Structures are given as structure tokens and as C-alpha cells.
């Protein structure tokens, strides 16, 4: 397998569209899958994996590699889809065996079964703690690679996250990048005006919380690839003695599929019939074309 690298923003937009189409097909073939979150996190995850991580399927044990921890582990189908797209796994194997006994692809990612998965996740609020441990170990070895983690806005209510956020800042772990997919909905309720995010609420309120804990924090439109690309490119150089970085991506659960975005909580998990699949595919093609026109 050759290392996949996409430089051009327009090509990243097209790749994100391809990933969304595959996620829609997976939702039809599998029948019941966490789908709202993967759709909203597709753009930033595509940019990280195909451009900024230097992800190399042939060198997954390189001690100097960047690492990606999917803290919101119920979005594992997104990483599995990317791995299949990169040629690491057979696409039909994923669709035919997903979440079945004895096969690698579970509803939550298992690092013992799926190469490319750094940490088994699913129980929320653990990704940042893993980042702290790996960040410390890398600093001790003088390794200046980044440790990325993708979190959900609902997940950010877990107290363990804020313990890790405080720890990372107080220990100057600037090799950590926390990316929050703020898609404004958990499995049960909207998260935008959560009182935990201060008077502002929403992504800006959450960013203020990160800053109060000693982090650099940036809020971006997580649906605009050009903005994602600019933000990731501007991350400070890792010194192993600076502030960790948080990127709060404002998105909508089910991003790119109209009927999902209209009822985001209802599409935390679900499945498509043939009609829904056709509608989703049409929406994704139109959405991708619109985003390409904006580049």
C-alpha cells in the first residue's frame, strides 16, 4: 500500500465527498450504525488523515509517527471507511462483517483487531488521557510528532476530559491537538446552549473553557475545507514545552444529508432503506458540488 497524500484543498473536498458516499452505503448495507457523527466529522478527519498526519499504512509501528485517537469511539465506521479507501482493508469485508462475532470491525474500534487503530475506545472521555500519556512518553524520547484526538461535543461533558485538559496544559504538552466535532447534538439532546460552556454557549463558549485551562483554542467552520486546511497548517511547531492546541469545529450532525441534518438527534444511530440511500446519495453529491464551487 502506498502512502496517500492529498495536497490540494479541492481534492480534499472531493475525497470527503467520496467518504460520505461510502458512509451512506455502509448505513444501507449494515442496517444500523452510528452515522450522524461520522458525517459531521468527515471533513476535518479527511484533512488530518490524507494531508496533515502523514499517515502511512506501511509504517504503522514507526515510533516517530503522528497518532490519532478516536475518543468518540462510536464513530469507528468513519476510520474503517478511510482505512478501506486507503487499501488497508477490503470494502466488502467491512460491510459484510461489521459488528459480527469473530470479525475485526466492531461498533467501537479495537486496536488488537484493526491495524491503524492506536487505542480501543468507546467509553467516552478517555482519548485526552491517552494523549497525555503518549505525549509524556514522546517528550521523554525527544519525539516531536503530534497526538491527535477527535472528540464529540456531548462527550466533552465527561469530567475526565477536563482533568486531562488541565493536566496537558500544566505539563506543557504542546504535542497534543484536540479536535472537537461540535455538531450541536448528542444522542438525546441539543448541545449548543449547554450551561457548561459559559454565557456564550456553543463552540465559542467551549473554546473559552479551553483557554481558561491554558490551551490555545480556535473555533472554525468545520464544513469549510479551506478553513480547516488553513487552521491545521497554522498549528504551532511542536517544542515539547508549550501550550496544547484545541480546534473546535462547528458542524451539524448528519452533515451533507438534508433529512439527517433536520433531525440530528434522531440520526445519532440508524439505518437507510433503498429510498433513504438514494436521497442521501443525491444530497451528498449536491453538497459536495456546492463545497467545490466555494473553493
What are these regions (language model features)?
Residues 209, 225-295:
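Glycine/aspartate-rich loop-and-adjacent alpha/beta segment that forms the canonical ThDP
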Residues 1-19, 23:
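N-terminal hydrophobic or amphipathic helices/low-complexity stretches enriched
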Residues 26, 38-170:
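Cofactor-binding active-site loop characterized by glycine-rich and histidine/acidic residues
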Residues 15-32, 181:
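N-terminal capping segment at the start of a domain
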Residues 31-39:
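Structural motif
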Residues 86, 193-195, 261-265:
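Short secondary-structure boundary/capping segments
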Residues 116, 120-239:
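Thiamine diphosphate
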Residues 69, 177, 219, 246-248:
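Structured core elements
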